[in-house]
């Protein structure tokens, strides 16, 4: 894989955004930059504590901002530059939105001494369902009338 000539520059930008956030607030030290074809589309920081939102990780906030900037949930061709190793939630959001590449500056090992490793989430997801800490159980419940998914399929373009 060819090296991204902007990777170091954008990773430094993500680290600087995270550092500014740390100095201003009490949020975790994470920043993210999203670019498409060499142009920055979004820059975001962790806002979990400020927003009382456990999903407001820097990468999630950047994905949201990029989608709004592009007026599309399709982030194909985009690259994420994250100050830290993405957690499973953020990585999944990037997969679902079509992000092409992800670069990170600080590894899980770098973050572990500070309680900032995402490793626990990856370990938990890799476990069989019956061995996970949190119960995840499907119950085959349906409402009377039209099926939910069939109704959605009937109003959604085939490409969705």
Give residue ranges: language-model regions.
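Zinc-dependent deaminase
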Residues: 1-23, 86, 93-160
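Short beta-strand scaffold segments in enzyme catalytic cores
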Residues: 30-38
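Residues at secondary-structure transition points
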Residues: 5, 28, 49-57, 85
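Small-residue (primarily alanine) positions within well-ordered alpha-helices
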Residues: 14, 18-21, 32, 58, ...
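Residues that line or immediately flank small-molecule/substrate-binding pockets and catalytic motifs
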Residues: 48, 82, 106
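Helix-adjacent hinge/juxtasegments
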Residues: 55-56, 60-97
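Short beta->alpha transition motifs characteristic of CBS
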Residues: 41-48
């Amino acid at each position: 894989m060819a090296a991204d000539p902007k990777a170091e520059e954008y990773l430094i930008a993500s680290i600087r955004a995270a550092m500014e956030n740390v100095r201003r607030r009490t949020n975790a030290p994470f920043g993210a930059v999203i670019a498409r074809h060499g142009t920055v589309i979004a820059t975001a920081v962790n806002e979990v504590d400020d927003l009382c939102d456990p999903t407001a990780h820097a990468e999630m906030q950047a994905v949201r901002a990029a989608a709004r900037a592009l007026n599309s949930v399709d982030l194909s061709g985009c690259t994420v530059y994250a100050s830290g190793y993405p957690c499973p939630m953020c990585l999944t959001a990037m997969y679902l939105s079509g992000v092409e590449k992800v670069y990170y500056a600080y590894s899980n090992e770098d973050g572990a001494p500070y309680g900032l490793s995402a490793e626990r989430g990856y370990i938990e997801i890799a476990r069989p369902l019956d061995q996970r800490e949190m119960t995840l159980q499907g119950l085959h419940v349906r409402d009377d009338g039209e099926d939910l998914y069939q109704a959605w399929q009937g109003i959604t373009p085939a490409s969705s």
